[in-house]
Every structure is written in structure tokens, then in C-alpha cells.
A protein has these predicted regions:
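Short, well-ordered beta-strand micro-motif
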Residues: 23, 92-94, 110-113
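Short helix-loop capping/hinge motifs at secondary-structure junctions, enriched
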Residues: 29, 98-101
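Active-site segment of metal-dependent pyrophosphate-handling enzymes
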Residues: 66-99
């Protein structure tokens, strides 16, 4: 069960139930492959009762990826318009130890270049990653409303089909 916490950006407190972390090294970011609705995303999860969001982000990152991290700062709060009413908080993090591993929540873990993100990165992460890289360069925390509707969820699945279809098209052209 998720617990609601408040995170303040520009003097306004926003309710959040989830916390994530962007671990950035140079031009690369840590992502994980979720098994259900399969897709790539940042590590993180739901806040437990009596757990601060920073601790959630660190705990979930370790459980999902095998990396122990240190929170470096706040990127922003992302509230939803559409399917969800709860918000997420995103932090910057640094790897302090551990080794990458697969888990029931992360079938694969890897560092990817910002210019070569996986095609199947969940669409709402593109803005979050732009914000995270800006934050790593000193930008102030942000609040953004992200629209996620059933259309977004259903159309996202088509990106998984494009990969094998593109491969078949390439073979036919040869």
C-alpha cells in the first residue's frame, strides 16, 4: 500500500505516493526494463507508510537494480492528469556501491546514452530525463503535470511491435 507524502517545489507542497531516481553519469542514465507493461523506466516505486520519499527512491533502486545510491538532490514533482491522481517525485542519485542485477521488477538494468534511449522507454520519462539532466547542471526543481490516458498506455504497446516488424522489413529489402 502506498503512503502519500508532500514534497515542496517553489513553496507549494505536492502530494506524492511514488519516488524515483535518475542516476546520471556523464551523458548516460540508469534505466531498468519493467516486465509488466514491458518498458524501460527509471528505478523507483511506491512510498511505504512512514517512509520518506528519498528513502523510498534509495530502497527501491537497491531492490530493483542491486545498486546502493546516495540522493544528490531534487529534480521535481510530476503530478498526473488522466489515469492517475497521485504524483511522483524524482531525485538525482549517485551510485555508492553494489552490482547490477536483475530482479522480479527489473528484467534488465543498464546505463544508456541520453541520445540513444530505448524505443520502449515509457513516454512520460522523456520530459523527466530532460529535467534530470538540467538538474544535474544546476537547474532548479520543477513541477510538471503529465497527461497519461488509456490511449497513451495502449499506443505504447505498439512500440514493442515496431521492433520485430522493422527487422522483417529490413530482411525483405535485402
Amino acid at each position: 500500500m502506498s503512503a502519500t507524502r508532500a514534497v515542496t517545489v517553489d513553496g507549494i507542497s505536492w502530494p506524492v505516493t511514488g519516488a524515483q531516481v535518475a542516476v546520471i553519469e556523464g551523458n548516460r542514465v540508469l534505466v531498468q526494463l519493467r516486465p509488466w507493461l514491458p518498458g524501460w523506466e527509471l528505478p523507483g516505486g511506491h512510498c511505504e507508510p512512514d517512509e520518506e520519499p528519498q528513502l523510498t527512491a534509495a530502497r527501491e533502486t537497491f531492490e530493483e537494480t542491486g545498486y546502493r545510491i546516495r540522493i544528490r538532490g531534487l529534480v521535481g514533482v510530476y503530478t498526473w492528469s488522466g489515469l492517475r491522481s497521485a504524483g511522483d517525485v524524482l531525485y538525482l542519485g549517485t551510485i555508492e556501491g553494489g552490482r547490477p542485477r536483475r530482479s522480479i521488477e527489473a528484467w534488465a538494468v543498464r546505463m544508456v546514452d541520453l541520445e540513444h534511449l530505448p524505443r520502449t522507454l515509457f513516454p512520460w520519462y522523456h520530459q523527466r530525463l530532460r529535467d534530470a539532466f538540467a538538474s544535474a547542471s544546476g537547474a532548479a526543481p520543477v513541477h510538471r503535470v503529465q497527461t497519461v490516458t488509456m490511449h497513451h498506455v495502449l499506443s505504447f504497446g505498439s512500440s514493442w511491435m515496431r521492433t520485430p516488424v522493422d527487422a522483417l522489413r529490413q530482411r525483405r529489402r535485402r
